[in-house]
């Protein structure tokens, strides 16, 4: 059974950056994509991007203009998202998810518990 364990809640200042981790277990890390999704009340779910650890390939939501950088460490089966130049609009719950692509669209079948990010001075 696939399991994704995310790092804990973060409280950071505006203008700084943060790195959230997602450790995978129970499956071959390099055989699936890891996607990242932003959840904000009143805004639903927003796909940020995804990474294929087996080759380091990445896809990003063009609307986010370089807000996020996705990386993966195959030695520890851990994926990371770094968010930069943080503002209050970045306050949200961030989820990682295991995915596959079908007909050029990602499908996620296992989700992390979510990491709450609060950006406040």
From Swiss-Prot:
GO biological processes: immunoglobulin mediated immune response
Recorded GO MF terms: antigen binding
A Gene Ontology cellular-component term: extracellular region
Pfam families reported for this sequence: V-set (PF07686)
PROSITE patterns found in the cross-reference section: IG_LIKE
Keywords from the UniProt entry: Adaptive immunity, Immunity, Immunoglobulin
Alphabetical list of InterPro entries matching this protein: Ig-like_dom, Ig-like_dom_sf, Ig-like_fold, Ig_sub, Ig_V-set, IgHV
Segments forming domain Ig-like: 1-112
Note: This sequence was translated from an mRNA isolated from a myeloma that secretes IgG2b.
The protein's name: Ig heavy chain V region MPC 11
């Amino acid at each position: 059974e696939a399991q994704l364990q995310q790092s804990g809640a973060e409280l950071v200042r505006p203008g700084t950056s943060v790195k959230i981790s997602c450790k995978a277990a129970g499956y071959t890390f390099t055989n699936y994509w890891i996607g990242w999704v932003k959840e904000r009340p009143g805004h639903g779910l927003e796909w940020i991007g995804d990474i294929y650890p087996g080759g380091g390939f990445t896809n990003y939501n063009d609307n986010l203009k370089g807000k996020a950088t996705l990386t993966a460490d195959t030695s520890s089966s851990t994926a990371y998202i770094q968010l930069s130049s943080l503002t209050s609009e970045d306050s949200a719950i961030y989820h990682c998810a295991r995915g596959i692509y079908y007909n050029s669209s990602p499908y996620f079948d296992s989700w992390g518990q979510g990491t709450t990010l609060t950006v406040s001075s």
